[in-house]
């Protein structure tokens, strides 16, 4: 069937900022879709609010809108661009919900625009729980017994009928947001209320529990000619009850019989036909009763999903690309397979290897939060690995997580083992049992501990419900450990075949010596240096032994067809097997190290940089070799680089690939902290590091050496000291004076960073600091209160420097730069200060002999400039600055690393802008109830958005809409501000009153407003216990905006319940005076002149006036 000629232009809806449940897999799918449509001559218009994406680069789409993802914005784009169709199926739940909202608002009909990829009826049928249930009953597919509730009363009736426990699933939400399991009468009301609030249509499905059943997913595609293909089957190791995004998953499925699998296939085909998805892909989830084989369908996503990205990377079948082509009328048999170049897309992929995906969590960023896993997703990232067997891919996936685990235990991580041995037999059993019963992020390692303690497969299965087949595989690894302890290096090849890393082999070799060294001491960190040195030495010996025995990995190709046809795309994984398929070329090549799994502090921004570096190398005619382990990303798409290795980013794995490929050098400065940690060891092995040298990086990141740099350049930094003991820390803090900022050296995302106000807090911090700091000293700085923080990105070729962006933070110093909104160009810095910042940046970059990118964080207080931190690498602000400046900064940095000078690059004389840009962050507090939303020096945000406008006020307001705040245009504002900021906020609060908002305030703020002629109603403080309080009003939806700026720890604790209620009831809550001022300024501007939208292409063509 030929392409539809009536579709000449398409608006692609992106997924917005990275949030838990919706990450960079949609940058991958959106980028694929845009490329595919453009290749077919279709004009592509793109809407996405996330600047850290490849898809929003202005050279991908014809018109790129970095604007709020709202119905009014879509309407303005439709008026202006007049597309023929909208593609909403590659932008996750955000895009689907926006498309449905546009349909409900009547604008699709008004502008005669068609939804492609999935029709409105099909989306509703799959997403609306009641319609889906009826559709399944029609075709005889069983769904869990359930009932729909739109209020608490209905929910109670359903509960009385079905009994407890019940699964609560809100309609039209992402990553299970708002979902939960109601086990008891006491928790039932709370879980249901939360679900109703989370659903955009205030609807929840209450479902009979199938906890403990096995969970499977099938990726399915269908075209207009009713061809249906099953791309991939995926099995969850964790049983039902854990969100699939939080579960370890395996492809293809491992434990179904052929008959059972064929049954799921048949059901999937029937389901996609009944729902009516006829031009794209869907993900269908099943539960299978492990005792009798009963099958229940759980849900269907009528779009490209997180699992689609995993399935694409697992099979090499580009689901999003093919879904985009199906949406414009092609059929599967008309689309060629890129990898084989001969088979059509209607050939189902066949794979002769096993893929394992493991989620990565960030509970350490949210102290006090419950780490129990359930139906609401909590993982912030994931790693994927490929092996010839499950054992091999499972161990590789665990070491890909980058959490200091090098496989399935036996890797030098002792905390669980030592704690277990400090208990008596009864206590130990109770402790292990509880961790196996309760799903949690470390449960797989408690399975290992249980085996070590003598548990049988049946005992472990009864506690955690993981299928026995997987437990047998894990038990097999333990048996091999014991065999290695007896036979040593004579079975090295056998050990490497099942994924054992050199670190694990080193540990097994030295286990007795290490345990004797620890002698039962739970403070492993006290002996960490000694242990690490022992393991490292032993690892090197094992490496020599492997080399002498010629036990080396081979590299196999992902070919979609289990070797039946030749594969043309160089997409590899390692294995200890016979035939090597890497076919290394003689072309000039450079290796790029990716960032590994997403985590807070290291996310999509670094993947963006890696992709841009690859494109730059290709432009220069240099073969790009990418190593990464993240299945969500554009960097692990087989056509982003010339050669892709899907491998863990450990020294062992990276060096083996380097030995195989023999590139001219390795680029480490784009993948965040992951590659930087490898720099010194790679250099010691003779690997050429391109760009800034590891020694220069060390001069910037090692505090002692960095202080020497600052003294040489006569630059200010906050008074500071370096402590290696509790006593030293106390002395330094006392000398500097509280408050102080403490942090370990070599961290990203403010890990373990804290503002300390008194000695008791310092003592508590130091109890944990040694373990966190990785044997690096503790840094203690004077905390600059009320300072303005500034972020600077610059390019340097070793001789000259170009400052690409000076960003002024909207929040005050003390909030991690990754959690602070910032504005470009700055709005309040004097010309003298801007000149001083430029001069300091130039001097630092040249002193450190930077070749490529550098990021510097400054603080300005009383017109004095202080250096906070220097990072001679790409920073998370680089994509934002690139979009604002209109220049591909990373490509320029790559060209510098390859020997070009700044003068040869097409840069302006200095940074210049036509619009004001604001970067705002997105925080995941809705996933972590009970955590205080007050920000500090440890980063917690998962994503970012970018507001662009002619004024800072409008740009900031846009950024708030993009970040998910439902900002009111009328209603009631609750104001509770500290004495320090009352005077500066007075005129802004007055503006709110003049905009027509009603004001309510606590006693002190109410009196201040009244004394200054501003009308407000007084409301009781929460801890007064007198009705009504602000909390009561929030619960009753009587408050629409909160301005709450606590000053001391006491007032923060007092207003904690208010901030928690704001999250639960989705009320925008501002906790800093600067954010309040910026928002109110934007609201005034919006009322006076409305808002405008421009594509990036238009913005970059405008006169540069700022």
From Swiss-Prot:
What superkingdom heads the lineage?
Answer: Bacteria
Q: Which annotated residues bind Mn(2+) 3? A: 857, 869
Q: Which residues bind Mg(2+) 4?
A: 869, 871
In this chain, the stretch annotated as Carbamoyl phosphate synthetic domain covers 583-964
- Boundaries of each ATP-grasp domain copy? 133-328, 707-898
Q: Which residues bind Mg(2+) 3?
A: 857, 869
Q: In which pathway does it act?
A: Amino-acid biosynthesis; L-arginine biosynthesis; carbamoyl phosphate from bicarbonate: step 1/1; Pyrimidine metabolism; UMP biosynthesis via de novo pathway; (S)-dihydroorotate from bicarbonate: step 1/3
Molecular functions (GO terms) = ATP binding; carbamoyl-phosphate synthase (ammonia) activity; carbamoyl-phosphate synthase (glutamine-hydrolyzing) activity; metal ion binding
Name a biological process GO annotation: 'de novo' UMP biosynthetic process
Q: List the cysteine pairs that form cystine.
A: none
Keyword presence, rRNA-binding: no
Q: Which cofactors does it use?
A: Mg(2+); Mn(2+)
Where Mg(2+) 1 binds, per the record, is at 285, 299
Residues that bind Mn(2+) 1: 285, 299
- List ligand-binding residues for ATP 2: 743, 782, 784, 789, 814-817, 857, 869
Residues annotated for Mn(2+) 2 binding in this entry:
299, 301
Asked whether the keyword Nucleotide-binding is assigned, the reply is: yes
Location of region: Oligomerization domain: 403-582
Domain remarks in the Swiss-Prot or TrEMBL record: The large subunit is composed of 2 ATP-grasp domains that are involved in binding the 2 ATP molecules needed for carbamoyl phosphate synthesis. The N-terminal ATP-grasp domain (referred to as the carboxyphosphate synthetic component) catalyzes the ATP-dependent phosphorylation of hydrogencarbonate to carboxyphosphate and the subsequent nucleophilic attack by ammonia to form a carbamate intermediate.
Q: How does it assemble?
A: Composed of two chains; the small (or glutamine) chain promotes the hydrolysis of glutamine to ammonia, which is used by the large (or ammonia) chain to synthesize carbamoyl phosphate. Tetramer of heterodimers (alpha,beta)4.
Which protein is depicted? Answer: Carbamoyl phosphate synthase large chain
Organism of origin: Leptospira interrogans serogroup Icterohaemorrhagiae serovar Lai (strain 56601)
Q: Which gene encodes it?
A: carB
